From Swiss-Prot:
GO terms for biological process: glycerol catabolic process. Its EC number is 1.1.5.3. One of its GO terms (cellular component) is glycerol-3-phosphate dehydrogenase (FAD) complex. It comes from Vibrio cholerae serotype O1 (strain M66-2). GO terms for molecular function: glycerol-3-phosphate dehydrogenase (quinone) activity. It is an enzyme of class 1 (oxidoreductase). It comes from the Bacteria. Gene3D superfamilies: FAD/NAD(P)-binding domain. This is Anaerobic glycerol-3-phosphate dehydrogenase subunit B. Keywords: Flavoprotein, FMN, Oxidoreductase. Pathway: Polyol metabolism; glycerol degradation via glycerol kinase pathway; glycerone phosphate from sn-glycerol 3-phosphate (anaerobic route): step 1/1. Conversion of glycerol 3-phosphate to dihydroxyacetone. Uses fumarate or nitrate as electron acceptor. Belongs to the anaerobic G-3-P dehydrogenase subunit B family. Composed of a catalytic GlpA/B dimer and of membrane bound GlpC.
Length: 436
């Protein structure tokens, strides 16, 4: 039997956050994840809180947590609290900074808007260096939108038309520039088969790189905002964006594209690299299928690939995600947590799972369904609390990450809070801890 201090189930942003925080504190950690996480589909920014459940728009996300607690006492942020939520987000920022993916937030702690691939504006709190933090006051003279020949996962006309609907941008010129990069012939079988990964590989060639720089400098000026799809990576994306800025002297705004999202992949790669370099053990491509319980404790877990070798730990953190990641499964009449059969908060009347209108002014009820936890994020099983198991991230009940714009923030805050409680249990046996 393999034994660890902390076993983390799930390799999304919550799972990696929990595993890294425990590892930094000197614990022996194993991380078990089934495959690619939802970070491959993400914007690469961290949303803390964009809207309250009643629909009110949030400007200062941490200041709004008191109002959130009044509206939804069972919200994950309400259980974690403002202080620990802020500590968790700042810890994550420092961790990513040290992994060479610096994230920025506004000096006054407010949300900023990021321009999406659709030309809409979305509230967020932490963004990568080449995501323009729009606050409603344009400090650019024109918007230049880069369209790459043969790349179908970005629609510049849609972005331009939607962005032009903003009243404050009505008089700002918006131009689309078509860029042709030599060398695509070896990557595609038809004219519209390119993916962001293909372009990222191609731009490592000097001729392709120079062609991109030359075409941009011919049409754009330093006082423009140049919006381009995130095509720089994979593994060296920020370095290449910095190089592009230095060569062209232009100001860039990267927008995520259809999967794979290189902005999201940057974060996952940074988290993975930090975990492995820190000495963590990762079982990638494996899946926890069940566990052994004794009273109020989880004593061991079994994985699909290591059925004859159970894994035991003093503490377990579960971050298997929601429906997309199969951390929750919905049947015709019920929603279940499939790994340990944990108790799930839900409405037994399926007719009450949704509103009559798909596009509704409020969150659909099923989006708030998830694993039931106590104030310390311990789940229960058949009504009995599991004392050495913590749940975090999208599998939790009590919130709608999409409607409220808080998915990344809740994932990080709950993971950090869970591990801080684990570390508190070691307080009597003081061990060296590395703090970032």
């Amino acid at each position: 039997m393999m034994h660890y201090d902390v076993a983390v189930i799930g390799g999304g942003i919550a799972g990696y956050s929990a595993a890294l925080r425990a590892l930094q504190a000197g614990k022996k950690v194993v991380l078990i994840n089934q495959g690619q996480s939802a970070l491959h589909f993400s914007s690469g920014s961290i949303d803390v809180l964009g809207r309250l459940p009643d629909g009110s728009v949030v400007n200062q996300p941490f200041d709004a947590l008191s109002a959130l607690q009044q509206q939804v006492p069972e919200h994950p942020y309400s259980k974690v609290g403002r202080k620990n939520s802020e500590k968790g987000l700042m810890w994550f920022k420092r961790t990513l900074d040290s992994a060479h993916v610096p994230l920025h937030h506004e000096p006054d702690g407010a949300n900023h808007w990021r321009i999406t691939p659709l030309g809409t504006l979305k509230n967020t709190w932490l963004s990568q260096p080449f995501v323009y933090p729009y606050r409603g006051n344009a400090d650019f003279s024109r918007i230049m939108i880069v369209a790459i020949d043969g790349y179908r996962d970005f629609q510049p006309a849609m972005l331009r038309d939607n962005l032009a609907q903003r009243p404050e941008l009505a008089n700002t010129p918006m131009l689309t520039v078509n860029v042709s990069i030599p060398g695509f012939e070896g990557f595609r079988r038809n004219p519209n088969e390119l993916r962001s990964i293909d372009i990222a590989r191609l731009l490592r060639q000097e001729s392709a790189w120079n062609a991109l720089c030359d075409q941009l400098m011919r049409v754009a000026r330093p006082d423009d905002l140049v919006i381009m799809p995130a095509i720089m990576g994979n593994g060296d994306g920020l370095h290449l964006m910095s190089k592009l800025q230095q060569v062209t002297q232009l100001r860039f705004h990267e927008v995520p594209t259809m999967p794979p999202s290189l902005l999201g992949i940057r974060i996952e790669e940074a988290l993975h690299r930090s975990f492995i370099q820190g000495g963590g053990v990762q079982l990638k491509g494996d899946k926890v299928i069940d566990g052994d319980f004794a009273g109020s404790r989880l004593t061991a877990i079994h994985t699909q690939n290591l059925r004859d070798f159970p894994i035991s730990a003093e503490h377990y953190v579960m971050a298997t995600g929601s429906y997309f990641s199969q951390g929750l499964q919905a049947s015709q009449h019920a929603i279940q947590e499939p790994t340990f059969a944990l108790d799930v908060q839900q409405n037994p009347d399926r007719a009450q799972w949704r509103h009559a209108q798909f596009i509704a002014a409020q969150s659909h009820p099923f989006m708030t369904f998830g694993v039931t936890t106590d104030a310390n994020l311990h789940p229960s099983r058949q009504g009995k609390t599991i004392d050495n198991l913590w749940c975090c991230g999208a599998m939790l009940s009590g919130y709608d990450p999409v409607f409220e714009g808080c998915g990344g923030g809740v994932a990080i805050a709950t993971a950090y809070h869970a591990v801080e409680q684990i570390l508190a249990t070691y307080a009597q046996t003081k061990q060296p801890e590395v703090l970032l």
